[in-house]
Amino acid sequence: MTTQYGFFIDSSRCTGCKTCELACKDYKDLTPEVSFRRIYEYAGGDWQEDNGVWHQNVFAYYLSISCNHCEDPACTKVCPSGAMHKREDGFVVVDEDVCIGCRYCHMACPYGAPQYNETKGHMTKCDGCYDRVAEGKKPICVESCPLRALDFGPIDELRKKHGDLAAVAPLPRAHFTKPNIVIKPNANSRPTGDTTGYLANPKEV
C-alpha cells in the first residue's frame, strides 16, 4: 500500500446542517434511499436537583460519518464475490460489475457504509472520491462543509496534527475495524458505550 487516506471530523464545529450529505448525494447522483455520508445526532440529558432547585442537564452533538476506509474492513472479509476490496491507496471500494447484491457487507460493517441500491440491484458505497483525489482535490463532502468541520488527507498526517481519537458515542469501538478517521470531540461528547444519551435520528443513518 502506498498512502492510506482518511477523514478528520471536527464534532466541535459540526452543526448537523447536512450540507456534506447533500453535496455527496448530488455529486454521486444517489437515489433517495442511499446516503454515503450521514449525520449522527447524539443527545441526552436529565434534571438535576441543587438545594431544592431543579436544573436541566441536556446535551447534543453531531458526527458526520461515511465509509471510514478501515485498516481491517469487515465488509471485504464477508464479500463472497470479491467485489468489495481495498485499493492500494487504502480506499475501500465495491466493483459494481462484480457485486451480486447479497448485502453481507452491509450486515458486517459496524458503520453501515455499504448500502443497497434498489435501482441498480447491487451494493454501493463511499469511494473517498478517489477520482477527485487523483486530481489533487479533496472529497466533495470536505470541500462543501460551510464550517470546515471535515478534512481529508494521509491518515498519518491527520493523526500527527489532530491526535488519534477514532470513536465517541454512538460509534462502535475503533479496535473492531481500525477506522481511518480522527475525531475532534464536541465539548459534550460521550465515550463509546455511553448510556446517558441516545441516537436521536436513527431513521436518517
Swiss-Prot record:
Cofactor(s) named in the record: [4Fe-4S] cluster
Binding sites annotated in the UniProt record for [4Fe-4S] cluster 3: C67, C70, C75, C109
Residues reported to bind [4Fe-4S] cluster 4: C79, C99, C102, C105
InterPro entries listed in its UniProt record: 4Fe4S_Fe-S-bd, 4Fe4S_Fe_S_CS, DMSO_DmsB, ET_IronSulfur_Cluster-Binding
Residue stretches of biased makeup (Polar residues): 186-195
Cofactor note: Binds 4 [4Fe-4S] clusters.
Residues the record lists as binding [4Fe-4S] cluster 2: C24, C126, C129, C141
UniProt keyword 4Fe-4S present: yes
GO MF term list: 4 iron, 4 sulfur cluster binding; dimethyl sulfoxide reductase activity; metal ion binding
Described purpose of this protein according to its UniProt entry: Electron transfer subunit of the terminal reductase during anaerobic growth on various sulfoxide and N-oxide compounds.
Designated name of the protein: Anaerobic dimethyl sulfoxide reductase chain B
UniProt organism field: Escherichia coli (strain K12)
Name of the gene: dmsB
